[in-house]
Amino acid sequence: MATSLSSAPTQLRPSPSPSHHRLLHRSSLLPFPRRHHHRRRRCGALSIARASASAKDGVTVRRFPAAPTEGGRLAGVRKIMILGAGPIVIGQACEFDYSGTQACKALAEEGYEVVLVNSNPATIMTDPDLAHRTYIGPMTPPLVERIIAAERPDALLPTMGGQTALNLAVSLADSGALDRLGVRLIGASLPAIRAAEDRQLFKQAMDRIGLKTPPSGIGTTLEECISIAEDIGEFPLIVRPAFTLGGTGGGIAYNRAEFEDICRAGLAASHTQQVLVEKSLLGWKEYELEVMRDMADNVVIICSIENIDPMGVHTGDSITVAPAQTLTDKEYQRLRDYSVAIIREIGVECGGSNVQFAVNPADGEVMVIEMNPRVSRSSALASKATGFPIAKMAAKLSVGYTLDQIPNDITKKTPASFEPSIDYVVTKIPRFAFEKFPGSEPVLTTQMKSVGEAMALGRTFQESFQKAVRSLETGFAGWGCAPIKELDWDWEKLKYSLRVPNPDRIHAIYAAFKKGMRIQDIHEISFIDKWFLTELKELVDVEQFLISRGLDQLSKDDFYQVKRRGFSDTQIAFATSSSETDVRLRRLALEVAPTYKRVDTCAAEFEANTPYMYSSYEYECESVPTNKKKVLILGGGPNRIGQGIEFDYCCCHASFALREAGYETIMMNSNPETVSTDYDTSDRLYFEPLTVEDVTNVIDLERPDGIIVQFGGQTPLKLALPIQQYLEDKKLVSASGTGLVKIWGTSPDSIDAAEDRKRFNAILEELGIEQPKGGIARSESDALSIASEVGYPVVVRPSYVLGGRAMEIVYNDEKLIKYLATAVQVDPERPVLVDKYLIDAIEIDVDALADSVGNVVIGGIMEHIEQAGIHSGDSACSLPTRTVSAKCLDIIRSWTTKLAKRLNVCGLMNCQYAITTSGEVFLLEANPRASRTVPFVSKAIGHPLAKYASLVMSGVTLPELGYTQEVVPKHVSVKEAVLPFEKFQGCDILLGPEMRSTGEVMGIDYEFSGAFAKAQIAAGQKLPLNGTVFLSLNDLTKRHLAEIGRGFRELGFNIIATSGTAKVLQLEGIPVEPVLKIHEGRPNARDMLKNGQIQVMVITSSGDALDSKDGLQLRRLALAYKVPIITTVDGARATIDAIKSLKNKSIETLALQDYFQTTDASQNLQAAQSAS
């Protein structure tokens, strides 16, 4: 007879308490120490630290006088300008759309007129109905000053837009613009910003209140930095630039050469050409505290966060846990007192701040690392972890309210001055994209490199950790119980992966435990606290227990104990050699199902009015589903390259529209950065992994009328077929009783038809739609045969990808064979698509909208600036098109309409076309879902396409919406991609078919040249109006050289070029100065770049691989010296037009509302809501 988990004394055994269970081990039969499973403080007492508090531990505190107010509001303030964060970049992602959106709503709620400045069209905050005036364009001091002069706001709030907004505010103050225009800074004063961001001033402030900082010095030149390093006396050293984002330009130096390289980069990246050189605290533990202060000098601690990775890894790249788990209560109180003293000393009078500490695990010594005097990435995490809306509260504090005057939105009974108390554990794990940047080393340092993150909540650390791993969507259903590659590594390789921080270190820990390494040994190599390692070792022991049992031997109690440790059905299936379906059926037969707990800010001491849920395997369920009409919207999970904020934007619009139309909306997502996971975006929020198991659990509980899968990108689309199969098997009746639960919009079968190459080819042939010649290869010989038939170059990619993953243009058999062997491992189960690459073709993007009765409307037709072959997500594009003939546009409209009808699209569809130089049109791909261009198109045409699409899915027709024909605006909108190359040393910056951009900006003007110029400036590309241009074009593009050369000469630029390019220009009669290539001698192009003799570079490559070493070096050097670099001919043409526009006229600044003469671009929704 099988022994159960709960009955065998020689097996793993839980303690009686379900929420504080421990495991017993064979070896000791003693419970492992479980220190601070969660920290819970009572909500009853007013948890405010006041200035009258006496100094503790040698820490002194200061009081600042409160600003004058009018009944809780700042005197004389009626109109407020909010600065956004600009495009999504590494270190500054959609958490600032979340904070900016909260701030806009909070201030409008208080009756203020809000003016918003932001360059990112993919944000909710830039919707024209959120602020009274919305400016989408470059965020540079001169242009923002002109907007301030036009709008005349009374105050400027810079603390909601990350480092971008803070630096911009400092520049405006330093230039005297704010004083000249009578604008006051709110949220954080200029002295407070300087004291926190300026490394020297911060260090002095800490010295004044008796707090330690690491031994360090401030350098403004390389020579000063070297002198500081000599004074400190030993490597490794940490370099931290001032006024930068995500540790940009910083790093860890282990020797003199590395140190000098990092210092050069740091000085160039710093807003003030200042870096902090400090002694390394590698191996110390790192903690963060989120702090808020009001004008009456009340201070509350919102949340403590602990980094599992020790010091040396940027907190954005570290796995973090809230509340802190390994602090004693005395240690926590000490950090709390220090945080209060710091926020007062720095002078943040009203709003939130993030304070980071290092603690020596040997003796408890504490050092202060840094402080952010603004809403930060950690603030968003703390908000989602606790349910306390930090950004909203910070916005209200900035206009004079005190914490005890602001009600808690979740409880409705407590004020914001009650510190949140939580009875669960939150784990955040970052997501990386090193595979997108070949040549870059996957090592984590003080410079942030992650592109997204997933968060999970559980009653224990183990449960939340496993759910967070599952939420990452990197192929793991949890931690362990999988055939990971690290199990095959030798000891040296495994130890290296444990010692050197990297994205896969958690899997190396699993492999080390499986191979028999002890907790102490892993701790000594990795410096990860033994408490966390003990928790992880228990999970390995539970897995071993499962392996020793068959599925049918697991009792109900066994299931509960295993599920409470976060194990998914997939993991249990792997360990018990069964299938996920078998596990689910067995679990449900034993009546083991998750319950849902509420995030309520007060550990259940008060009733929560806002249903914000997470799952756990306990006995009481706090989710109370209704029998109203309702819709479940599946989000996009963690941000990644190819699937980012644009999809979250669509999910939010679906929730807004359907709530307005009378539906109860339920959001399910795992991304803490987003607006979709804000507590008030939907009627109910389930913060859960997006897997078949977790989604079907919510479906079983809620039984919604509809499920929306087409807005969250590839994540929910991959779930569509298994969810459809589940619904067909279960035949669940919706809670409202109006019919069966079903997937709304385009059917999963139609989605599959568009993704399956064979089915899709048959549909195109039936409709008479042309596509590039190509085929499906299931072996190397297949691929070579197809390439021979269609002719090189060819585009090769795996089927079912998003963001051009593993896509490449290859030019010969040798490169194709290498691609098949290294990039995709082609076989019959993993076919590869091989298509003819259309040289010099123009690429077109189309977003269309279709309803359930066959009406189709073109939302927008965009023309890419770069040629076909560069991923659409990395290419700039314009709307309307500028060079496409009416005939080609008619073909595109006809084919898009026919395809939407044939696929029975209900909702959004995106199509991509290529137009050859001879005017032939080819369809490249079609996606019956929301695309990443939907927010851009919506802003460009003044119609909220995602809102329309969600209403269409509910049964409203396009005529009922009043949206029946394509809108072609009089103005021109240009979208430009923002790329993160400066974060990935060693990788080339050439663009290709694999997407690598992290974000986007938008420029709007009545001429293309002006719109393109605005987009370039907004993306950080400084366009010079004169100087010297360096030209180096490869043989494929030299035929365009004369045109490009003449264009720059007509603008007054001098031209320098490498020998081959110079000869072509001289033959065309264009003046040019030849320059040596790097390998030809000196002075060469590299020397001229370093000497500041080159203002703009045009340098192309064949794109079949990294080109000559010279080209790679020059491109990387141009990036380091912030010289604009253009890598395509079409990009060079557009840049010439843009510079001409900038020379001929000043940049015009208009609000989005001015282009549409309305303050609400979604007014057509009124008819739809009444119709539905």
UniProtKB/Swiss-Prot annotation:
<feature type="binding site">
    <location>
        <position position="246"/>
    </location>
    <ligand>
        <name>ATP 1</name>
    </ligand>
</feature>
<keyword id="KW-0677">Repeat</keyword>
<dbReference type="InterPro" id="IPR011607">
    <property type="entry name" value="MGS-like_dom"/>
</dbReference>
<keyword id="KW-0479">Metal-binding</keyword>
<feature type="binding site">
    <location>
        <position position="286"/>
    </location>
    <ligand>
        <name>ATP 1</name>
    </ligand>
</feature>
<dbReference type="InterPro" id="IPR005483">
    <property type="entry name" value="CbamoylP_synth_lsu_CPSase_dom"/>
</dbReference>
<feature type="binding site">
    <location>
        <position position="356"/>
    </location>
    <ligand>
        <name>Mg(2+) 1</name>
    </ligand>
</feature>
<keyword id="KW-0460">Magnesium</keyword>
<feature type="binding site">
    <location>
        <position position="370"/>
    </location>
    <ligand>
        <name>ATP 1</name>
    </ligand>
</feature>
<feature type="region of interest" description="Allosteric domain">
    <location>
        <begin position="1020"/>
        <end position="1172"/>
    </location>
</feature>
<feature type="binding site">
    <location>
        <position position="927"/>
    </location>
    <ligand>
        <name>Mg(2+) 4</name>
    </ligand>
</feature>
<feature type="binding site">
    <location>
        <position position="912"/>
    </location>
    <ligand>
        <name>Mg(2+) 3</name>
    </ligand>
</feature>
<feature type="compositionally biased region" description="Polar residues">
    <location>
        <begin position="1"/>
        <end position="10"/>
    </location>
</feature>
<feature type="binding site">
    <location>
        <position position="356"/>
    </location>
    <ligand>
        <name>ATP 1</name>
    </ligand>
</feature>
<feature type="binding site">
    <location>
        <position position="871"/>
    </location>
    <ligand>
        <name>ATP 2</name>
    </ligand>
</feature>
<dbReference type="GO" id="GO:0006221">
    <property type="term" value="P:pyrimidine nucleotide biosynthetic process"/>
</dbReference>
<dbReference type="GO" id="GO:0005737">
    <property type="term" value="C:cytoplasm"/>
</dbReference>
<dbReference type="InterPro" id="IPR036914">
    <property type="entry name" value="MGS-like_dom_sf"/>
</dbReference>
<dbReference type="InterPro" id="IPR006275">
    <property type="entry name" value="CarbamoylP_synth_lsu"/>
</dbReference>
<dbReference type="InterPro" id="IPR005480">
    <property type="entry name" value="CarbamoylP_synth_lsu_oligo"/>
</dbReference>
<dbReference type="GO" id="GO:0006526">
    <property type="term" value="P:L-arginine biosynthetic process"/>
</dbReference>
<feature type="region of interest" description="Carbamoyl phosphate synthetic domain">
    <location>
        <begin position="624"/>
        <end position="1019"/>
    </location>
</feature>
<feature type="binding site">
    <location>
        <position position="313"/>
    </location>
    <ligand>
        <name>ATP 1</name>
    </ligand>
</feature>
<feature type="binding site">
    <location>
        <position position="925"/>
    </location>
    <ligand>
        <name>Mg(2+) 4</name>
    </ligand>
</feature>
<dbReference type="GO" id="GO:0006541">
    <property type="term" value="P:glutamine metabolic process"/>
</dbReference>
<feature type="binding site">
    <location>
        <position position="370"/>
    </location>
    <ligand>
        <name>Mg(2+) 2</name>
    </ligand>
</feature>
<feature type="binding site">
    <location>
        <position position="869"/>
    </location>
    <ligand>
        <name>ATP 2</name>
    </ligand>
</feature>
<dbReference type="InterPro" id="IPR011761">
    <property type="entry name" value="ATP-grasp"/>
</dbReference>
<feature type="binding site">
    <location>
        <position position="240"/>
    </location>
    <ligand>
        <name>ATP 1</name>
    </ligand>
</feature>
<feature type="domain" description="ATP-grasp 2">
    <location>
        <begin position="761"/>
        <end position="954"/>
    </location>
</feature>
<feature type="region of interest" description="Carboxyphosphate synthetic domain">
    <location>
        <begin position="72"/>
        <end position="473"/>
    </location>
</feature>
<feature type="binding site">
    <location>
        <position position="314"/>
    </location>
    <ligand>
        <name>ATP 1</name>
    </ligand>
</feature>
<feature type="binding site">
    <location>
        <position position="312"/>
    </location>
    <ligand>
        <name>ATP 1</name>
    </ligand>
</feature>
<feature type="binding site">
    <location>
        <position position="199"/>
    </location>
    <ligand>
        <name>ATP 1</name>
    </ligand>
</feature>
<feature type="domain" description="MGS-like">
    <location>
        <begin position="1021"/>
        <end position="1162"/>
    </location>
</feature>
<keyword id="KW-0436">Ligase</keyword>
<dbReference type="GO" id="GO:0004088">
    <property type="term" value="F:carbamoyl-phosphate synthase (glutamine-hydrolyzing) activity"/>
</dbReference>
<dbReference type="InterPro" id="IPR016185">
    <property type="entry name" value="PreATP-grasp_dom_sf"/>
</dbReference>
<feature type="binding site">
    <location>
        <position position="925"/>
    </location>
    <ligand>
        <name>Mg(2+) 3</name>
    </ligand>
</feature>
<feature type="transit peptide" description="Chloroplast">
    <location>
        <begin position="1"/>
        <end position="50"/>
    </location>
</feature>
<feature type="domain" description="ATP-grasp 1">
    <location>
        <begin position="203"/>
        <end position="399"/>
    </location>
</feature>
<keyword id="KW-0547">Nucleotide-binding</keyword>
